[in-house]
Amino acid sequence: MEEKTLKISKIKDGTVIDHIPSGKALRVLSILGIRDDVDYTVSVGMHVPSSKMEYKDVIKIENRSLDKNELDMISLTAPNATISIIKNYEISEKFKVELPPKLIGIIKCKNQNCITNTREPVKPEFEIVSRHPLVLRCVYCQRTMNERDVFE
């Protein structure tokens, strides 16, 4: 008989990010601005066995919710991630992240000559060219960027 144990303890209130591709938890923590000086509990499970993905990463963040920009950024690196909102140790809401058709004002264009990188008041705007592998295109200069370009 297979033994089942909970490797990361439950949280009372906060957010669980599950089904992160194995090895990408640190990138998600970076997206969320979570560093070593936080004043809330953050639990990270990396390379956790998964029936759906073989291996996955999981992040539990006590007393913290995520905004739309953070969810959009997570969808770029973990397009199949599941978000669970926890209240009093119970899941109050559960949903998958969703890559929007356009990303406006949340990432920078890598083209230094793009109008969005000058002193003009223009927000960067990207269209999704491909989801797997991730390819984005700047609507202003047409520069394409992959996942590595976005997170460098």
From Swiss-Prot:
- Which residues hold Zn(2+)? C109, C114, C138, C141
From the Swiss-Prot or TrEMBL record, give the protein name.
Aspartate carbamoyltransferase regulatory chain
Gene Ontology biological process terms in this record: 'de novo' pyrimidine nucleobase biosynthetic process; pyrimidine nucleotide biosynthetic process
What the entry lists under SUPFAM superfamilies is as follows: Aspartate carbamoyltransferase, Regulatory-chain, C-terminal domain, Aspartate carbamoyltransferase, Regulatory-chain, N-terminal domain
Q: How does it assemble?
A: Contains catalytic and regulatory chains.
One Pfam family from the UniProt entry?
Answer: PyrI
Q: Which family does it belong to?
A: Belongs to the PyrI family.
Which cofactors go with this protein?
A: Zn(2+)
As to how many cofactors bind and how, the note says:
Binds 1 zinc ion per subunit.
Any idea which UniProt keywords this protein has?
Metal-binding, Pyrimidine biosynthesis, Zinc
* Cellular component GO terms held in the UniProt record: aspartate carbamoyltransferase complex
Q: What GO molecular functions are on record for this protein?
A: metal ion binding
HAMAP family according to UniProt:
Asp_carb_tr_reg
Species whose genome carries this gene: Thermoplasma volcanium (strain ATCC 51530 / DSM 4299 / JCM 9571 / NBRC 15438 / GSS1)
> Function, please?
Involved in allosteric regulation of aspartate carbamoyltransferase.
InterPro entries per the UniProt record, alphabetical = Asp_carbamoyltransf_reg_N, Asp_carbamoylTrfase_reg, Asp_carbamoyltrfase_reg_C, Asp_carbatrfase_reg_C_sf, Asp_carbatrfase_reg_N_sf
